[in-house]
UniProtKB/Swiss-Prot annotation:
One of its GO terms (molecular function) is protein serine/threonine kinase activity. CDD domains: STKc_MAP3K-like. This is Probable serine/threonine-protein kinase DDB_G0278521. It comes from Dictyostelium discoideum (Social amoeba). Pfam families: Ank_2, PK_Tyr_Ser-Thr. It catalyses: L-seryl-[protein] + ATP = O-phospho-L-seryl-[protein] + ADP + H(+); L-threonyl-[protein] + ATP = O-phospho-L-threonyl-[protein] + ADP + H(+). Keywords: ANK repeat, ATP-binding, Kinase, Membrane, Nucleotide-binding, Repeat, Serine/threonine-protein kinase, Transferase, Transmembrane, Transmembrane helix. Belongs to the protein kinase superfamily. TKL Ser/Thr protein kinase family. InterPro entries: Ankyrin_rpt, Ankyrin_rpt-contain_sf, Kinase-like_dom_sf, Prot_kinase_dom, Protein_kinase_ATP_BS, Ser-Thr/Tyr_kinase_cat_dom, Ser/Thr_Kinases-Pseudokinases, Tyr_kinase_AS. It comes from the Eukaryota. GO terms for cellular component: cytoplasm; membrane. Residues 175-908 are cytoplasmic. Its EC number is 2.7.11.1.
Length: 908
């Protein structure tokens, strides 16, 4: 015999009280396999639960059968009571009759005790009924935590699990109690006639479907009303002693204790639901009146129409008087609910002019919700019926946004086709040039936006593409592609997430390529000739080339696919990580604090990023190509160009503001973007001296769970101590890197320049910091020290840093190496900040706002998603080469690819 059979046998013995809990426990200790099956796998208790359910059904059947076999129990019991009351007076005269009655009573009581015993057992194990219901998804969805009586629960159970016999038994029992209660209020002589007339009226006048199967079963298979009344009184009698002088009265049964939930489960039933609904309405019209406002679910306020899942049921409910404009607790109409759940046939029945573009409390239309469910056929039906694409919800999301959350590629392609027709079949609205400049947020360079002044429509779709005058849209922008009439769908929502951002945030990478194509960012590899291109940067898994493309110089980042495949990664993994970085660069391309992405190539054997070429190279190159010595040292020709660049650069204030402004924007996004490799190698300087943040190859967004642990990525010299220690990290790792960049700009040295990189990272992890020159103003020193504080919680945010820098004195990058000598006060101040981990920067002198920033520094950003190319779960990075100046090989050593004397000051 298998273990499962043995366990089932034990369960039966347990149910019949042959063994108890101690026996089961002892057996589990003796036999390890029993321990696994009984305790660990819970098979024993699940078997008991299953047997309880079968027993539940069996007892109900037994009750019904017993009542049928003993229809005159109540008369015999009452006679027995009368005999007991008059026993002393009539003992001699009725001795023989009394003996006969006593025998009958004894037999009846024996039979009744069996029923009573099983009923008590049924009540004791009713928690198993609750367990079955509470684990049922449909029951949980409709109930929403509402408390139900056991009677309501049994009715719901009978409907959900199609236990028709139990359901009919219960309904007859309910009717018997209701009419029994009515009889107590009427004349006893007319009680039975009135009762029968009432039931006849309920069954005939209000019955919606005659001779259906439920009514036939109801009348034929279940005990009569008198039998049920007798059963009820017998149950009550069992609680009395045999010497009771009068039979205990049955407590009045009030139908108001019943709730509306059972009929909702009948409505949801796909097979036989219509007949069951009609039956319930005919039997208990006062309880299950679906047109009554009290019939709405108490918590969700949803009417019966919300839970219809078929066309037939929907038409039945509409015929019965259900209102299509009934709102639930979220302000949703039934059409909203069914659009969200993809019930196409139901939505067809609910569409009219008043519902097609109706808004719920979140300003979602049925089309918004259908797009979120990714139902293409439903979206087409709604659009052909007059639904509009141009209505956004309170989160600023249009149907295209929700479609990208779902990731249905066919639906997204359909929307893209509609957007393209918007401009190819109609006149474009007039355009206005707008420029926005603020003091605390970054502003875009002057861009052209389409401002809608009148509604435009597509003739083929019945006004379904009417542009909205909502200010949240700001007009749909022209796409980046070659077709200037192509309508861009890079529309940010209230959290600055565009449709393509939502795709990558929900891991729909393949579909993201479709949107990149639509926006004109995808190009073919045949446009680039790497044989004639000059390599200007390299790393372990990627190279950067200077290429002439479409009549301009660009930097092309080329991923070494074969090299990465050798490390064990799949092409899909490589491509997905690459798309993350490309999408991030697309969003940052309009803003001066970030390197612009012109195009990308995503093919099986080629992954390319076509980037803006920054003439002055990286900040690292500028700071580290210097003459060795102090002021007045002889400058050779190798450094003349570099000195010219340094002299032409803006102050450290402006450069640091530019960097901090961009990082502040990244950290303010939802989800938050963490660069994770903020070093001077990844800060590029264009010909105008504007600092641009580059290389988002290992950036990542912070999810809702919280801080993440991070593998040792990036340059060890700029790596925060929590990263080196493998601890949880936050956006404060970028603040640490920013502090190291400030140190490098003031000293023209990398942190711990006289140590190997790994040794430098260990010194940082041990709370050591490179010495600060005494020539640095103490206010700048304080900022650097608080940024690289050992405790991440003590580091300021970039928003605070922006305010601080506005109040610092002007400082410039020195022409030569600065002696690293410190006075005693600076050492003590630094030790206090690093070792006590309680340093707090004094912001009392900071101004309340930042004003009159350089236009190159204040650029308004519109990024909403992260990069993440070869992110923290990988053991390598392409990152350091995308600054296309120098890279790090596998050992982290600097690789010099300079071959042209004139370019040595630009790309090392």
């Amino acid at each position: 015999m298998s273990n499962n059979k043995i366990i089932e046998s034990l369960a039966i013995l347990y149910l019949n009280n042959y063994i108890n809990d101690n026996d089961i426990y002892s057996l589990s200790l003796i036999n390890r396999e029993f321990h696994i099956n009984i305790i660990k796998d819970d098979y024993f208790y699940s078997t008991i639960n299953k047997n309880y359910l079968f027993l539940y059904i069996k007892i109900f059947k037994l009750l019904s059968i017993k009542v049928k076999l003993n229809p005159n129990w109540i008369n015999i019991i009452n006679n027995n009571n009368n005999i007991n009351n008059n026993n002393n007076n009539n003992n001699n005269n009725n001795n023989n009759n009394n003996n006969n009655n006593n025998n009958k009573i004894k037999l009846i009581k024996n039979n009744f005790s069996v029923i009573s015993e099983r009923l008590n057992f049924l009540i004791q194990c009713k928690f198993n009924l609750h367990r079955y219901l509470d684990n049922n998804d449909l029951f949980i969805t409709i109930l929403r935590g509402e408390k139900l009586s056991t009677l309501d629960r049994i009715i719901c159970f009978s409907i959900i699990y199609s236990q028709d016999q139990i359901l009919l038994f219960l309904l007859n029992f309910i009717l018997s109690n209701i009419n029994c209660n009515n009889n107590n209020n009427n004349n006893n002589n007319n009680n039975n006639n009135n009762n029968n007339n009432n039931i006849s009226n309920i069954s005939n006048s209000n019955r919606l479907l005659a001779n259906n199967s439920y009514n036939i079963q109801f009348n034929q298979q279940i005990p009569t009303q008198n039998e049920l009344i007798n059963l009820n009184k017998c149950l009550q009698f069992s609680t009395s002693t045999t010497t009771t002088t009068t039979t205990t009265m049955v407590p009045p049964f009030n139908e108001n204790i019943l709730k509306v939930y059972p009929i909702y489960f009948a409505i949801v039933k796909v097979i036989g639901g219509g007949s069951l609904v009609r039956f319930l309405l005919s039997i208990l019209p006062n309880v299950y009146n679906i047109t009554n406002v009290n019939c709405k679910l108490p918590i969700t306020n949803r009417s019966a129409l919300f839970y219809s899942t078929t066309r037939e049921m929907t038409l039945l409910l509409l015929q019965l008087g259900c209102n299509i404009h009934d709102m639930d607790y979220k302000g949703m109409l039934p059409i909203h609910y069914h659009s969200l759940n993809g019930h196409v046939d139901v939505v067809k029945c609910l569409i009219d002019d008043s519902t097609i573009n109706a808004l719920d409390q979140s300003n979602n239309t049925p089309l918004n919700l259908a797009s979120l469910s990714g139902n293409l056929s439903l979206a087409k039906i709604l659009l052909n019926s007059g639904a509009r694409l141009s209505i956004d919800n309170l989160n600023g999301r249009y149907p295209i946004h929700n479609a990208c959350v779902n990731g249905n590629i066919d639906l997204i392609r359909y929307f893209l086709e509609l957007y393209s027709k918007m401009n190819s079949t109609t006149l474009l609205p007039s355009t206005t040039t707008t420029t926005t400049t603020t003091t605390t947020t970054m502003t875009t360079t002057t861009t052209t936006a389409i401002t809608t002044t009148t509604a435009t429509t597509i003739q083929n779709n019945s006004n379904n593409l009417t542009n909205s005058n909502s200010s949240s849209v700001g007009g749909l922008r022209i796409s980046n592609g070659g077709n200037t009439q192509q309508q861009s769908i890079q529309i940010p929502d209230k959290e600055n997430n565009t449709p393509i951002d939502l795709l990558v945030l929900n891991n729909h990478f393949t579909i993201a390529i479709e949107l990149l194509k639509y926006e004109g960012y995808i190009v073919g590899k045949e446009e680039f000739n790497f044989k004639t291109a000059r390599k200007i940067g390299a790393g372990a898994f990627g190279d950067v080339y200077l290429v002439e493309w479409r009549n301009k110089n660009v930097a092309v980042k080329r991923v070494k696919i074969e090299k990465i495949l050798e490390s064990g990664k799949s092409y899909q993994w490589i491509r997905d990580k690459f798309i993350l970085e490309a999408v991030l660069m697309v969003k940052l391309s309009n803003f001066s604090s970030f390197v612009k992405l012109y195009a990308t190539c995503i093919e099986e054997k080629e992954l390319l990023l076509v980037l803006e070429f920054c003439d002055n190279g990286s900040l690292y190159t500028i700071l580290n190509t210097i003459p060795i010595g102090g002021a007045g040292a002889n400058n050779n020709n190798n450094n003349n160009n570099n000195n010219d660049i340094i002299q032409s650069l803006p102050s450290i204030n402006t450069l640091s503001l530019n960097i901090a402004n961009g990082m502040n924007y990244l950290h303010s996004l939802k989800p938050q973007i963490i660069h994770r490799d903020l070093t001077s190698q990844n800060i590029l300087i264009d010909r105008n001296g504007i600092a641009k943040i580059a290389d988002f190859g290992i950036s990542r967004f912070k999810n809702d769970i919280g801080d993440k642990t991070m593998t040792s990525i990036g340059n060890p010299r700029f790596r925060s101590p929590e990263v080196t220690k493998g601890q949880k990290y936050s956006e404060k790792v970028d603040v640490f890197g920013f502090g190291m960049i400030l140190y490098e700009m003031f000293t023209r040295r990398v942190p711990f320049h006289d140590y190997e990189q790994i040794a430098a990272s260990f010194k940082i992890a041990n709370a050591e910091r490179p010495p600060l020159p005494q020539t640095i103003d103490h206010r700048w020193s304080n900022l650097i020290q608080i940024c690289w504080d050992q405790n991440p919680n003590n580091r300021p945010s970039f928003d605070q840093i922006l305010t601080i820098i506005q109040n610092l004195p002007i400082a410039n990058i020195p022409k030569f190496l600065v002696p690293l000598q410190q006075n005693q006060n600076q050492i003590q101040n630094q030790n206090q900040n690093q070792n006590q981990n309680n340093g707090k920067l004094d912001l009392s002198t900071s101004s309340s706002s930042i004003t009159n920033l350089n236009n190159a520094v204040t650029a308004k950003l519109s990024l909403s998603t992260s990069g993440g190319l070869f992110s923290g779960d990988s053991d390598y990075t392409v990152g350091t080469c995308s600054g296309y100046d120098i890279g790090y090989d596998n050992d982290g050593d600097i690789i010099d690819y300079s071959s042209d004397q004139n370019d040595s000051d630009l790309y090392d």
